[in-house]
């Protein structure tokens, strides 16, 4: 069994034209149940080593807070200290052979596709499109592991998309043909991110990937972005997203919701 942690970066809801957040990224961190406890322990040790008590009651690892801290607690530590911690966490992921699957969506390009395909007034959250693509890679990855192992999705609790995510997983698990998620069991599970260090690690990965993808569309990057990307890139598992099939599925599901449109 594999635990598949999902988190996003660059979520601007229905605003697909925000110049400050041109890219949405969904990441999935794939963790074997045999390694889960060891990963949690290693992450916790790194936290205790880097972030001394007393900590704020709402203490949580957020990549954006480590890069550009707003709280007094994290501002008290120099950038080099915060970078060393992020590097340590990403090294833990590599040491335990965790795999990362992601999908980046350029929002303006996605917006143009929506208008071209459905006309004005139709909104599909980029999270749902990215989930459908990422899930195909994950399903293939699990199927190719010896014994064709199973996996379960665990997502950050996001009320904005939780219902649609749950629906998409259910539909894809029951889909006909090659898109069917044969290796994913049950529904998606949602937990509060402060309760899961692995989910917080996924948040860090998603941030790093988003910054890299923003650089690809012309956004200026900083040296820290390149440093962190060099640690994330080796974790990435590539695979067939079945893009054409997913696009057809999105179109079909939208037509079911808007019969006669």
Language model regions located:
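Phosphate-ester processing/binding pockets and catalytic centers
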Residues: 1-261
């Amino acid at each position: 069994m594999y635990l598949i942690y999902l988190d996003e970066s660059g979520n601007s809801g229905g605003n697909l034209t925000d110049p400050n957040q041109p890219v949405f990224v969904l990441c999935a961190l794939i963790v074997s149940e045999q390694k889960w406890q060891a990963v949690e322990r290693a992450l916790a040790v790194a936290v205790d080593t880097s972030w001394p008590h007393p900590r704020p009651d709402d203490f949580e690892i957020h990549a954006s807070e480590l890069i550009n801290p707003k709280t007094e607690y994290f501002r008290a530590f120099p950038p080099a200290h915060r970078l060393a911690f992020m590097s340590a966490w990403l090294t833990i992921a590599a040491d335990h052979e965790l795999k990362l699957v992601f999908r980046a969506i350029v929002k303006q390009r996605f917006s143009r596709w929506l208008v071209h395909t459905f006309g004005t007034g139709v909104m599909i959250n980029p999270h749902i499109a990215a989930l459908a693509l990422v899930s195909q890679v994950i399903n293939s990855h699990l199927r190719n592991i010896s014994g064709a192992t199973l996996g379960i999705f665990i997502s950050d609790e996001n009320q904005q998309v939780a219902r649609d995510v749950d629906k998409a997983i259910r539909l894809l698990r029951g889909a006909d043909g090659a898109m069917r998620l044969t290796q994913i069991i049950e529904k998606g599970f949602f937990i509060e991110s402060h309760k899961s260090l692995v989910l917080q690690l996924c948040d860090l990965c998603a941030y790093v990937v988003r910054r890299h993808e923003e650089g690809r569309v012309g956004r200026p990057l900083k040296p820290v972005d390149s440093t962190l990307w060099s640690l994330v890139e080796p974790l990435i598992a590539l695979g067939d997203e079945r893009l054409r099939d997913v696009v057809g599925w999105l179109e079909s599901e939208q037509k079911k919701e808007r019969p006669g449109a």
